[in-house]
Amino acid sequence: MSEVKNGTHVREVTDETFGTEVEAHRGAAIVDLWAEWCGPCRALGPIVDDLAREFEGRVKVAKLDIDNNPVTTARYNVRSIPTLLFFRDGQLVESVVGLRSRNELAARIAKLAA
């Protein structure tokens, strides 16, 4: 089972929970693939947390630590981080690599949730 990260609206997922939490989810979901040692990932984290609050009830937001979850990382061919994976009804519809502005991500999430 995934857990809510530090009281935020973001779920921590693992290789074991990714299928049930993301791929089996009906509706919109985004997954932030990150690592503790990644500076841009640490900069993106608060933005993702804020967007999770803004889109609560419309988009499921999860984080996956790539260092501890190599199966999912390889399955989605993640080669650079941060990477955001956008899913609709369990299907990958878009991926965004690199640090992006809050406004750009909010627009992408709003489109996904529409």
Task: Say what each PLM segment does.
Residues K63:
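Conserved residues in the N-terminal Rossmann fold of short-chain dehydrogenase/reductase
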Residues M1-V59, N68-T83, R88-A114:
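Proteins that catalyze or organize thiol-disulfide redox chemistry
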